[in-house]
Amino acid sequence: MTHILGISAYYHDSAAALVKDGVIVAAVQEERFTRKKHDASFPTQGINYCLGEAGISLKEVDYIVFYEKPLVTFERLLETYLAFAPRGLRSFIAAMSAWLQEKLYLKTVLKKALAELGDCKTKDLPPLLFNEHHQSHAASAFFPSPFDEAAVLCMDGVGEWATTSLWSGQGNQLTPHWEIHFPHSLGLLYSAFTYYTGFKVNSGEYKLMGLAPYGEPKYVDLILDNLLDLKADGTFRLNMAYFNYATGLTMTNKKFADLFGAPRRSPESPLTQREMDIAASIQVVTEKVVLRLGNTVYEELGLENLCLAGGVALNCVANGRLLREGKFKNIWIQPAAGDAGGAIGAALSVWHQYLQNERMVRKPDAMAGSYLGPRFTNEEIETYLKGPAVQAVYDYYSDEDLFGKVAHILAGGNVVGWFQGRMEFGPRALGGRSIIGDPRNTTMQSVMNLKIKYRESFRPFAPSVLAEKVGDYFELDQPSPYMLIVADVREELRLPLTPEQEQLFGIEKLNIPRSQLPAITHVDNSARIQTVHPETNPRYYQLLRQFEALTDCGVLVNTSFNVRGEPIVCTPEDAYRCFMRTEMDYLVLENFVLAKTAQPQREQDQKWQEEFELD
């Protein structure tokens, strides 16, 4: 029996994952425990959870593997500053301070943290290995996939040097083919526009994607003529005269601002049509790059299956176009496509490539629906609810009665916090830690955004749909279990717009019902789809079945169980606190149902939102 612990840390979204004889036992992001979004610190609590789930101590782990090679990253930093000198002196001093104090000695830092966690001496630790960043991404994409053979495309900000890489996977082997190197990066290009439009880098990219349909792509030629030299095969180079991220303390510079005619939007200031048009433009460019790269990969390798990982693989609009317009028969995307997923990839790399163990292809995949985090029993939940600090009022329902009860609550227009089973690994809530509602409700989108999530009104919500019924509602004929593919709502479900509505522009498009499922239909008639399967989440599936039986609608609104700036809830305590602080109507904790109106009145703490830094 072999246990391998994978670790991702010290950049953003630190995480731990445990693999036992090639099977992913547990995986979790540290932010879920510390309640600090995108927490980059050493994942002490994540590791402890993974070890506990496996029922072992750190001393019983056979190998520990870090998801990237820090010394190669340091080499890249030095070479970059030399290449751009004398630019970037302030940034160089800041970077060197961090590296010379800690990052350069990461092996020692890791061993010290692990020894402290395992209550042992560093010499008694299991072997500590280091994997390349893009190899970790590629392994996370291919090894859990349902394919024996596939092309693997990784696109992100930057690893050690690579920003885009192509691999082929067969059996237990991953073979690298080519890379695009820093500073030429599709992920950093998208992040530069995220920064310029006033959103937070490594956090707000999905907002830019959601904003794009409100705009017109009028800057596409400007981007392609000045910023991005895009070749017919999808490879590219950036014009670094417009960017600051290689050597500066910001993503873009004055020349970039001059190109677009105005300074960067201040965070939290009102959005204008310009930001919407810029968002639409960079989204079109990104899709163009991804489609060209996809076609090149297909022509080069001739494989019908494609696996994706890296932060760019979270651009579900581009993924949807690649699926519809690309040449691949099947596409599988790692649900934790960002750096957190590198913990899984690093561990699987050791099992399959370092130890040369055979790979068993699992259907529908080897990610267990991405439900790899903590779970809580009814006994644990009731102990919390009965506690003197809470004294919650609740009803208990058997499984036989629970789903029908919650379906009736949802059909009545109520918003429900849904806390069931193991927590999701990755950025998406998939029915384990979700806030759910009736998609037919015309006010549900605005209520959820403004009164529950406390976030920007323009942001769309995703549908969860019974897997076998996805084609009844959406222009999609294959599973999308991880909410990573966007497709259009079927035309027969769309509502005709009046001539006046047709003339609406930009943010004026908001709150116009566009289909029979208005709460999940974006302004361009698209939806970010999650198909729900009985094999991976039987309880959420049963709820959808009961809701369909009651309403003739096999779809629910699904958004992550948190408020803006807060990590997705992990524990019953997190869930109850979020429930009480927002305008959710009901909370379902496993078999317990809590009505907001029945809960003890508490003094309103208006400062609680300051706990979470806005994302």
Curated annotation (Swiss-Prot):
SUPFAM superfamilies named in the record: Actin-like ATPase domain
Domain of life, source organism: Bacteria
Keywords: Transferase
Cysteines engaged in disulfide bonds, as pairs: none
Record InterPro entries: ATPase_NBD, Carbam_trans_C, Carbam_trans_C_sf, Carbtransf_dom, NodU/CmcH_Carbamoyltrnsfr
Gene Ontology MF terms in the entry: transferase activity
GO terms classed as biological process: biosynthetic process
Family that this chain belongs to: Belongs to the NodU/CmcH family.
Protein name, as recorded: Uncharacterized protein sll1178
